[in-house]
Amino acid sequence: MKFIDELDIERVNQVLNFETIDCKIVGGCDIFTTKAVASDRKLYKTIDHHLDTILQDNESYNLALQQQIALDAEDKNERSMSPGGQRRDSSSFWEQKRRMSVSDSPIYLQHINGNLNESNGAQGEIVADLVPPIIKTSKLNDHNLKELVSNYEAGYSSSSSVESLTHKNKERRTSSLSSTGGKVDKLRADSSTANDITARSVLNDTSRTLNLGPFGPINEPSSRRTFAYLIAILNASYPDHDFSLLEPTDFKRSSIKSFIAKFENSMYSLGRKPEEWIWEVINSHMTLSDCVLYQYCPTQSFLDDEPGHLWSLIGFFFNKKRKRVAYVYLLASRLQLAVNNAIGTPDEMQNEDGTFRNNNTTSFDNNNTQFEGEYDLTYEENAIVDDDDEE
């Protein structure tokens, strides 16, 4: 990538470099073209290999997850089709069947029969035979069954009709329950199959279009190239560091307005009033309305290892139409550390023989002769005393 040197951009960099009472601020705007050079092509190959490794790891993870889903589905099918499960279903069915209400001994409407016999004579007996019995409900047990059969054999109704009626009711209930159970099993099987198909399709789609970070699918060349542009700019700005192993998730996409607001708020907190002409100059070279902003926000920044580092704000304005990337940054570090470095470290203040150098010395220039002396404020008896001091 080629660095673009502009005079008005240099003015922006001068304004963004200053010191406060306790901080040193290093800011600026560097503009690069996306035209690749020989070193960039080598970097692009390294980044492609790194992203291919990430993609392979993701595919292996998806394959293991798909196998686990298939095993879980097989376990569910085995549990639903196991004999123990069927016995449990049948036992629960007969338990419900046992608790169902059945007909007790049939009782005719005697008062109705009596009234009919008194009024109609022989016709009352015929009507009485046609009146259905009132059924008293109770739980099914052996005593009720014997009583029911004996009563019907005595003349209330034929045992064959009772058996046929009971058999029909039993078949109807059994068929309804079996059909309901079959529908439930079919729905469960269909739902499990649909879930498996959905999970597999999602996994396949994920493996084909894996989105890591704000750049889109990493298997597409355009997404990889955009990610490589930012890595190349960081390598050019900080040659002592290697950023080729950064992850796409170390960046995030944000709006340009929010980034400008953060930038100006940081300037306000540092006691500087933001200048509107700064963004006008950047806009003249980048056309911010056509730009996409990627903000560098890793979990652990390389600047954390720098001595005295406090915070940083780094953004990349990418204009695909103009084939340019603007690197806008604002870095803050402690100023006290710079003052201590100016004074000197203990190693720098030590002489060759191991003794420490005394910096409280003065030099006098008298006829091109260097005289070096020290201030000694201790009192000695042999010291020379002026006459004025004795008086």
Curated annotation (Swiss-Prot):
Chain residue ranges for the region called Disordered: 75-96, 159-189, 348-368
Swiss-Prot/TrEMBL GO biological process terms: negative regulation of transcription by RNA polymerase III
Biased composition (Low complexity): 356-368
Keyword vocabulary terms for this entry: Nucleus, Repressor, Transcription, Transcription regulation
Signal peptide boundaries: none
Domain of life of the native organism: Eukaryota
Listed Basic and acidic residues bias regions: 86-96, 165-174
Location of this chain's protein in the cell: Nucleus
GO cellular component: cytoplasm; nucleolus
InterPro entries (alphabetical): Maf1 (IPR015257), Maf1_sf (IPR038564)
GO MF annotation list: RNA polymerase III core binding
Record-linked Pfam families: Maf1
UniProt function note: Mediator of diverse signals that repress RNA polymerase III transcription. Inhibits the de novo assembly of TFIIIB onto DNA.
Family recorded in the similarity comment: Belongs to the MAF1 family.
Name assigned to this protein: Repressor of RNA polymerase III transcription MAF1
Gene: MAF1
